[in-house]
């Protein structure tokens, strides 16, 4: 035979990539009602989150946005802004802002949540929120604003990539964002 099976290294099995960013949030919104999870005690935000999800599923994005903002305010006051459930709620609020056509707000909320997760040492969640911020950033059409937001995004993204974890394992996404920055710089130069 051409290859001796005893001396060849088997191909590593492909690594499962979890849903990240707004994809993960969308899966949660479209998934089961958090109040009805089998064997799991619903958290204190299960009821409000279920109502927000119902509004999103029904296409009532303005209602969902209002509910999310009020719930974030109330939950932050009760639990603290960096409590895990509040962070998940803020991820949901960012997704709703994106659906509502407010990519700048979605960007800022996602990046703030990414920073909180990084500070807590959760690189997977931090990178997921960087991905959400990147999705929102790509929806910003004004080149100068896109450059400003992109600088902020790439700063955190590069830091996460140098620290290892999922951001380091996905260099093509970061390279793609850097390429977009080049295109934005070219467009901004024409606009000025």
Language-model-detected regions and their locations in the chain:
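TPR repeat positional signature
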Residues: 48-51, 68, 90-93, 110, ...
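Helix N-cap/loop-to-helix boundary motif
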Residues: 80-84, 123-124, 164-171
């Amino acid at each position: 035979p051409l290859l001796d099976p005893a001396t060849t290294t088997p191909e590593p099995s492909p690594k499962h990539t979890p849903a990240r960013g707004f994809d993960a949030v969308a899966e949660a919104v479209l998934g089961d009602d958090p109040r009805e999870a089998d064997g799991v005690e619903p958290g204190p935000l299960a009821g409000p989150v279920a109502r927000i999800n119902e509004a999103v599923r029904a296409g009532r994005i303005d209602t969902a946005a209002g509910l999310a903002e009020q719930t974030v305010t109330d939950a932050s006051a009760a639990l603290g802004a960096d409590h895990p459930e509040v962070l998940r709620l803020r991820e949901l609020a960012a997704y709703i802002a994106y659906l509502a056509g407010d990519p700048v707000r979605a960007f800022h909320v996602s990046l703030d949540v990414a920073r909180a997760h990084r500070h807590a040492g959760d690189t997977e969640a931090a990178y997921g929120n960087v991905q959400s911020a990147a999705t929102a950033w790509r929806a910003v059409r004004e080149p100068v604003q896109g450059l400003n937001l992109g600088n902020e995004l790439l700063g955190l993204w590069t830091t996460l990539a140098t620290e290892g974890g999922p951001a380091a394992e996905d260099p093509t996404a970061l390279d793609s964002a850097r390429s977009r920055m080049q295109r934005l710089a070219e467009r901004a130069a024409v606009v000025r």
